[in-house]
Amino acid sequence: MSASSDSAKLAGLNKLIISYPQSKLVGDAYGAQFSVLMSLHRDSAAFFAAHNYLAAKDSQSLPGALHNVAMELAFRRQYPDSALILVDSAISLYREKHGRLAPVLLHTRAMSLFLLKRFAEAELTQREAITLLPASAIFDPRYSNYFAQLGMIQLETHPGVEGLEQYVHASFISSQPSVEYANLDSLFHSRVKDSTSVVRVRDSLFERTANEYLHNFTDTSRAKSFIAESFSRNRVFTGRALQFAREAYREAAMRSLQERCDAAASLGIVLSNAGHNGEAEKFLVEALQTALPSATELFLALGSVQESLGKKNEAFTTYLAGVVVSRPSVLMKPLQALQKELYPHASIDSMITVALRRWVDFFPEKYQRPDSLDGQPNQKTVLAELFTGSECRPCQAADIAYNKLLERYDRAELAVLEYHLHIPRPDPMANTDTELRSEYYGVNSTPTSIIDGTNVINSGGLGIAARAKFAVYADAVDHSLTTPAKASVKISAKILRSKVSFVVSASVTNARKSYKLRVVLAEDGIRYQGANGISEHRFVVRKMIRGAGGTSFNQNGKVTVKDAFAVSTIEDQLENYLTTYEEKMQKPGTLFKEKKSEIDPKQLYIVAFVQDDATHRILESTIVKVKR
């Protein structure tokens, strides 16, 4: 950050403190002020801000605040004695409150001890911090700095290569090495007496770490991609890096789109590091299908490759896509340089705003049945089920993506059902059957998407991630559409004077006891806006007719479900469920801002599907609009 931007930030913080002295934010404003003042080397003013920051904290938040100040001092390598006093106070308060230690507190303490040249004590403290990390931390990039710091300390306490082993380990697992261990060659030359042995010793340590990593993961394809990127980034075994990356890409060919794109990104990055820019571009572009704006390394690699190939406009678009949420300097710098050359009179902020809209407002292509499937009997209708919640912010991307699926596919190709759940807070479109259906699949988080009963796709995101989620969902649907239907389902449904009547008949060959026909009443286009900002909800499950358990087939592999009911009956059931739920939560009449029990008869659909309860596989599904 530049001195001018630091000064501007400082002015803004001062204004907040002066204008709103009673605000709860004032304490944190002093904390931010402390950090900025330290970067400006205004130490006296910084310590005054730190004092006010700590004074504003209650007993609950004081340990964290003490640690924040200590960490700022220690990792700026300033005032280590003060840092040690502060972090020791934080440790004492934290242990008193929680009865245990936190690894991050010990990590900061070890750094303070190191700066005070109390190396033996620093090593013991850092080792203790590492023992408190999760078991998976040894190969988790988020914890690489713990191993790097141990290596830094050991270089002072051990004459051999023990410290180098920790540096290599940290450099291997980290996606973005810190300054502490970026230049390994100079460290090896300072420790290995025989200069001719430097490369051999360095490579042997990397190879050993890679072998340990490979043996710790059952998914060898993903492991190979990780190792390939690490070797390439650290400039060791470049030939083997390319070999591993290509193998991982081939092995991912039959996996999900997300896995294929991850492998393509790794291969593209390795190729670009090796100077094979033409080939690298192909794989990096492929990886964009599921990329989020936070994929800085991918956008940087692709933009750099495109610039090297003389494709400046494409490079500009690539860099622009990577700065729509945050503005990482590694992307902003080349973006601004290209903007001055290509669009000198345009506003970079306006261009970023337009680029941001493209992440959410995209237009999917209509599905085209592959020629290879022509003549295939029993074309299938895929069922996509989404477990979501109107109060679930991470469900935003999944909800938008499902709406885009409905644009891509006709209802003869895809049926959609959305089950609303009380996650993380009460949802007025939830009901008994949506809860039972979530129990059937073992769903305990939202969003969860399930394609044809067996392809479970978890994780969500805000609207900015909708395009990537859509690509993953559409790939799964496309794949399911290549398999023929294993059952026949026919529906006739009508509504007369607010009474729905329907007949569903289904047949299968080689019927099993585990085969069930399930019939669902869904309502399209419910208007309601919860915390996730989605205002229209598509194909919401209102009732599973004959229960969530479904209906069994007879010995001849046939089943018919015939029923009639008043819409008001379903509305009463939904209203009673919501009222009972409020009472259960001891908030009668106040839990929901609006009870969405009223049904629009013009927007009703019957969805029926045959499912194998032994495997959850859906053999066929059908959707029809209830005719008036």
Segments from the language model and where they lie:
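Structural register within alpha-helical repeat arrays
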Residues: 33, 69, 109, 143, ...
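Short solvent-exposed coil/turn linkers within tandem alpha-helical repeat scaffolds
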Residues: 16-28, 56-62, 77, 93-101, ...
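Structural motif corresponding to the intra-repeat A-B loop/turn of tetratricopeptide repeats
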Residues: 3, 40, 76-77, 116, ...
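Short, conserved sequence motifs used for protein processing/export or organelle targeting and
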Residues: 419-628
